[in-house]
């Protein structure tokens, strides 16, 4: 009925098969988790690029309108981005406001040539951008991200001003 010599060998082999299966399954799980996290982060970074493109189009559109023209802007951002900031290096930059958001942000803003930042700054490889015709009413103008960012753009003749709603 049972061949004892084969059964003994099979019993010795079975734990190794189970261990090997567990190791392979855990490696597949870890690799899948890593790939999915990277895809989600890449998607969020792409959404930042779309946000920048949409904002740049709005600024260019209202720059070409008459002085005093304004619009409410509502753009979407990924939840991992805490703040959307606009700043001008040409005017006084309020260090205390930036320190409330993130310590060290003032140093980052004073060293770059861009005027738009997504905080945390290092979340995406490209989190600093420049729109030449855009100036904030407050310096810096940082808006808390709730999934959507709301602010007003107004043509001031030589530039487009951004302010909180």
Identify the meaning behind each predicted range:
Residues 11-15:
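Juxtamembrane loop-transmembrane helix junctions in multi-pass integral membrane proteins
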Residues 1-10:
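N-terminal leader/signal peptides at the extreme start of proteins
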Residues 2-3, 16-165:
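Long, compositionally biased, intrinsically disordered regions
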